[in-house]
């Protein structure tokens, strides 16, 4: 089981990717319920949130704890009002979810079998399904940074599979709600005749979860990064490093292109400028990338756009999104020796699991037609030698120094 893998330090990216696909497939196939359903109203979203505060408050006597709870309640109410448009436009899905395995990222992985959860509001499946609200709670504490990396990877992979980037605006609201549910459960578990030691232990657990909820109400640090380089140079790996290390959301051009236009026809296979890769399709794909980037940034998350960005006008359009949203802009200028690119391409084609259709001929054409970064772009760029293990470590450290909140 997953909790055993986690306890043994064996839980890895493959497990997370598989879980993301299983849950994404479930949500995409789940039946929908009508908007007029009693559980489909905004008020039904807020009722259990308010209930948390009402049930927690009688257990607290410390002034600092009470002040924190009041601040969290005020934030929850203001967030609920700010997100009114999201509640009304979100697509409702199944109102009952049978969960056989669910994650929690605070301290460990919990396994729930045969549990039938009645959802208070089944909005966009991503933030409101109870399983995913648990997924959103990253591992904190010494010796567990890899759990946070895996939680971030799950979020990005799930979004990539479903395309439900608009649901991100609801994520921190629900993460805070779920953290306070865990805080409440800790208080409920305290015996009525608890001694001083038991009460102190319970309050310590409560405060850990309350602090976790508070962290989700903080003003976020955001960033818009784009990759720049030919196919098979390692851009997707570079982008995923930003996901795991900084909590960015990766948006892949290959995925969004096919979400828009479907698969390339066999007759056009290997062609650089026909079918779903013609000029109009490429322009629409980059436009969609930039729309998603704006959505992710509005939700308070950093974003990395995983595309070739070989043309200057494409990069300028991305820079404009960063300017309009008031966030730093970074170009990850990806390089690798030609022999390395060729070997990675061969491996990718053999595995047949990547959405890219690029061939060696396509890559050579890209190398010949790419527009080099100009002087102004170089100011916002950093070189990444993708074959060098430590290159991205340096980039991530530079970003953290510039944006300590990440």
PLM-predicted stretches and their roles:
Residues 238:
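Hydrophobic positions on the alpha1 helix immediately C-terminal to the Walker A/P-loop
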Residues 243-301, 343:
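Conserved substrate/cofactor phosphate-moiety recognition/catalytic segment
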Residues 347-396, 406:
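Small-molecule kinase domains that catalyze NTP-dependent phosphoryl transfer to phosphate-bearing small molecules
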Residues 2-105, 109-223:
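ATP-dependent phospho-/nucleotidyl transfer catalytic cores
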Residues 235:
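Conserved lysine of the Walker
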Residues 231:
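The conserved Walker
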Residues 227:
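Hydrophobic anchor at the beta1->P-loop junction of P-loop NTPases
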Residues 325-345:
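Conserved phosphate-donor/acceptor-positioning beta-strand/loop module used by diverse small-molecule
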């Amino acid at each position: 089981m997953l909790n055993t893998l986690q306890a043994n330090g064996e839980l890895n990216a493959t497990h997370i990717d598989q879980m993301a696909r299983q849950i994404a497939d479930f949500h995409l196939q789940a039946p929908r319920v009508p908007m007029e359903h009693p559980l489909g109203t905004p008020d039904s979203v807020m009722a259990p949130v308010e209930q948390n505060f009402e049930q927690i408050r009688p257990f607290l006597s410390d002034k600092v704890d009470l002040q924190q709870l009041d601040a969290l309640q005020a934030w929850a109410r203001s967030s609920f009002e700010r997100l009114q448009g999201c509640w009304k436009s979100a697509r409702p899905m199944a109102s009952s979810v049978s969960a056989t395995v669910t994650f929690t990222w605070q301290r460990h992985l919990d396994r729930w079998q045969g549990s039938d959860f009645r959802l208070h509001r089944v909005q966009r499946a991503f933030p409101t399904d109870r399983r995913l609200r648990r997924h959103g709670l990253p591992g904190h504490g010494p010796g567990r940074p890899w759990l946070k990396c895996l939680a971030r990877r799950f979020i990005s992979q799930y979004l990539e599979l479903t395309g439900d980037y608009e649901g991100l605006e609801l994520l921190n609201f629900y993460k805070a709600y779920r953290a306070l549910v865990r805080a409440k459960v800790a208080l409920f578990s305290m015996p009525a005749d608890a001694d001083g030691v038991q009460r102190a232990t319970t309050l310590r657990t409560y405060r850990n979860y309350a602090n976790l909820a508070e962290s989700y109400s903080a003003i976020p640090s955001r960033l818009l990064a784009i990759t720049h380089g030919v196919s098979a140079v390692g851009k997707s790996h570079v982008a995923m490093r930003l996901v795991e290390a900084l909590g960015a959301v990766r948006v892949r051009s290959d995925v969004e292109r096919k979400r828009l236009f479907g698969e390339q026809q066999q007759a056009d296979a290997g062609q650089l400028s026909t079918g779903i890769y013609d000029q109009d399709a490429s322009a629409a794909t980059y436009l969609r990338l930039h729309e998603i980037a704006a959505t992710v940034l509005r939700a308070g998350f950093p974003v990395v756009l995983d595309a070739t960005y070989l043309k200057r006008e494409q990069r300028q359009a991305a820079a404009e999104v960063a300017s309009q949203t008031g966030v730093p802009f970074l170009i990850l200028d990806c390089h690798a020796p030609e022999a390395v690119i060729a070997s990675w391409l061969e491996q990718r084609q053999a595995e047949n699991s990547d959405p890219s259709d690029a061939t060696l001929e396509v890559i050579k054409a890209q190398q010949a037609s790419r527009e080099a970064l100009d002087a102004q772009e170089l100011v916002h760029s950093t070189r990444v030698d993708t074959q060098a293990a430590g290159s991205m470590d340096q980039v991530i450290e530079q970003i953290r120094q510039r944006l300590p909140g990440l």
